[in-house]
């Protein structure tokens, strides 16, 4: 890897940890808060320096559009836009009624045209986040979580799941005898789901996040 200053290495390591933990890079504001910068502009300067050194790639206009370069095993890389690439039209899912499919027409409030650079892989829909149970993963109330429909997920991935009549966003971990749905906020309890529970259904995995007000 190109030689980095100590501060640049801190920023690079923070980006990588965020991608490994949540599936998407941090925003400039999150980098600034984590590393004690005076403002997001200071984080932007370090990101541009890293881009000039060829270790990251930045997507213009995307607050989380950061891609690590030259790392074969880096998970959840963002695909940056190429010339002529079409925008994605994604349905926004609001409240979900008990017992009905998450993409049922009555749950879709509108559609958004989104830059593919915002996502780690192609999502199927956006889900409006309610509550702060995933706050420490950078997922806040009112954010739009990009979700790819899946019936399986890996340990550590952030998932969307049905739990009884509710739809929840949590981090998945397998435990003896079942699954643990982990909240990223100490004010919220984790949820244990027994193996084979009819109350649980995986709806998809998180592949990106749009901060409220960015669209």
UniProtKB/Swiss-Prot annotation:
Superkingdom assignment: Bacteria
GO terms assigned for molecular function: DNA binding; serine-type endopeptidase activity
Key words, A-Z: Autocatalytic cleavage, DNA damage, DNA repair, DNA replication, DNA-binding, Hydrolase, Repressor, SOS response, Transcription, Transcription regulation
DNA-binding region coordinates: 28-48
Site annotation Cleavage: residues: 98-99
Active site: 133, 170
InterPro entries cross-referenced by the UniProt entry: LexA (IPR006200), LexA-like (IPR039418), LexA/Signal_pep-like_sf (IPR036286), LexA_DNA-bd_dom (IPR006199), LexA_repressor (IPR050077), Peptidase_S24_LexA (IPR006197), Peptidase_S24_S26A/B/C (IPR015927), WH-like_DNA-bd_sf (IPR036388)
Gene3D superfamilies per the UniProt record, alphabetical: Umud Fragment, subunit A, Winged helix-like DNA-binding domain superfamily/Winged helix DNA-binding domain
EC number: 3.4.21.88
Catalyzed reactions per annotation: Hydrolysis of Ala-|-Gly bond in repressor LexA
SUPFAM superfamilies: LexA/Signal peptidase (SSF51306), Winged helix' DNA-binding domain (SSF46785)
GO terms under biological process: DNA repair; DNA replication; negative regulation of DNA-templated transcription; proteolysis; SOS response
The protein's assembly and partners: Homodimer.
Protein family per UniProt: Belongs to the peptidase S24 family.
UniProt function note: Represses a number of genes involved in the response to DNA damage (SOS response), including recA and lexA. In the presence of single-stranded DNA, RecA interacts with LexA causing an autocatalytic cleavage which disrupts the DNA-binding part of LexA, leading to derepression of the SOS regulon and eventually DNA repair.
Protein known as: LexA repressor
Provenance organism: Burkholderia ambifaria (strain MC40-6)
UniProt gene name: lexA
């Amino acid at each position: 890897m190109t030689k980095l200053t100590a501060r640049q290495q801190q920023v690079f390591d923070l980006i990588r940890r965020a991608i490994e933990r949540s599936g998407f890079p941090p925003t400039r504001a999150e980098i600034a808060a984590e590393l004690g910068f005076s403002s997001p502009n200071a984080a932007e300067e370090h990101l541009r320096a890293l881009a000039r050194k060829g270790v990251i790639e930045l997507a213009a206009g995307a607050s989380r559009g950061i891609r690590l370069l030259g790392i074969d095993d880096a998970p959840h890389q963002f695909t940056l836009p190429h010339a002529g690439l079409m925008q994605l039209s994604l349905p926004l899912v609001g409240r979900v009624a008990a017992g009905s499919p998450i993409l049922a027409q009555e749950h879709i409030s509108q559609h958004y045209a989104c830059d593919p650079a915002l996502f780690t892989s192609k999502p199927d829909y956006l889900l409006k986040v309610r509550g702060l149970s995933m706050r420490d993963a950078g997922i806040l109330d009112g954010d739009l979580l990009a979700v790819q429909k899946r019936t399986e997920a890996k340990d550590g991935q952030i998932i969307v799941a049905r739990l009884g009549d509710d739809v929840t966003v949590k981090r998945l971990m397998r435990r003896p005898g079942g699954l643990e749905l982990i909240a990223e906020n100490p004010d919220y309890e984790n949820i244990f789901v027994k193996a084979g529970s009819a109350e649980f259904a995986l709806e998809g995995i998180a592949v990106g996040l749009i901060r409220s007000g960015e669209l």
